[in-house]
Amino acid sequence: MIIRGFFSALIALAVLVQPTSADETCMSPYMAKIVGQEDYVYIWTLGLEGVGDGEDKLVTVDVNPDSETYAQVIHSISMGGRHEAHHSGLTDDRRYLWASGLDTSKIFIFDVHTDPAAPKLHRTIADFVEKTGGVVGPHTNYALPGRMLITGLSNNRDHGGRTGMAEYTNGGDFITSVWMPTDDNLQGAEKSGSFADGYGYDARALPRRNVLVTSSFTGWNNYMMNLGKMMGDAEAMKRFGNTVVIWDLHSRKPKKILDVPGAPLEIRCAWGSRSNYCFTTTALTSKVWLIYEDETGEWQAKAVADIGDASKIPLPVDISISADDNHLWINTWNDGLTRLYDISDPFAPKQIMEEQIGEQVNMVSQSWDGERVYFTSSLLANWDKTSASEGNDLQYFKLYKWDGKSLTPEFNLDFVELGLGAPHQMRFGAHALYGGMTAQSPSGLITTPPAH
């Protein structure tokens, strides 16, 4: 249930947020990384009625400054309707991009290797709910060796927050599913505090520690509900997750359930070979949480920083950790700000800058070298703002240059003006991934993932 002190403030504000995942520094450790200049950004975009064809679509933008079509939309492919386009993720070989819909529970698999500039629909998974035994709302698409791990947000019995995860082959064949631990079925997990709610959201792996970490949000009944209606429903406002679960990565069995009250969302794990910790933020309480392994080998959760003025409900959404583990970008949707935290001491993060990005801001993705930072705006169809104050953008894809001190705008694409819709998840592509450029190309790779 939601912390009481924030309940009335949320009702009064009548805003809540559904955020998402990020970019090159936040991808699966099983993947090669683009460490030079990315060539393309693939943007999973929510269709808007009255905007273009009104359909969800995968939009490709050229982001290589040496290209003749730099800062332009060079390709888009529509999905035949609106599915509540939300998250996407690449397979470990980066040949396929998986993109899912939270409403229809369909998953679209795109071929991004044959022609990285023009992805093609390879396969559609339309029986996700049936195959998984009732999981609804495929959310995070996360690469494991030869497999994709898909987290759910809901179920087909009561469309609440209890849910599970599924595994597929890279080609889209179902393997297995597992449900989140609950009070009535802990599945052998240790309940360390007050909660075992069975909710799901994001997932990240630390293979060298044999650990998988999952977070929790809310179910279909809430994320597909009209925002105003939901905010006026006291029972609906109680249905948000308060847990992070530590899993045995190899067996996929839950080990420990941690209390992280207030809807813990994105999980971002440190890259250092001795850095056994991850960060998350709570949407309802505006806090940074550290999920860490202590000196005894036990996993713990600790609130380590505030995000803005919690009384004003800034609503933290997407986060992105730098490749050197020293900085964490945190977007807050309600005020349209991005904030940068110094996390060199993970137990004492400090905010060092903030910047207005738009009327609302959701996703943040950075290049591996940290020099380029991308932003998009959309949350959910029934939750997005419908107008912007003077001087602020509403639905956009933006690139900024980062020099270690300040953000400098590079370009801004208005997705409504372009007839595309509401931009959400971003993923990077590069010709060098598929042998399409020489070793001297500005696009580069880490061919073997770093220790993680």
Task: Enumerate the language-model features and the residues they cover.
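Beta-strand-rich domains and repeat architectures in extracellular enzymes and scaffolds
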Residues: 23-63, 70-95, 99
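Blade-loop segments of beta-propeller domains
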Residues: 70-140
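Asp-box/WD-like beta-propeller blade repeats and closely related beta-sheet repeat scaffolds
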Residues: 113-206
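Beta-propeller domains
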Residues: 91, 193-339
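Loop/turn-rich, solvent-exposed surfaces of beta-rich toroidal or solenoidal domains
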Residues: 311-390
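Short, conserved, GDST-rich strand-edge loop motifs in beta-rich repeat architectures
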Residues: 43-53, 151-161, 215-239, 376-397
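Beta-rich, blade/repeat-based domains predominating
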Residues: 25-32, 53, 80-92, 130-144, ...
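Short loop/turn segments immediately following beta-strands, especially the blade-tip
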Residues: 61-68, 109-119, 169-173, 290-300, ...
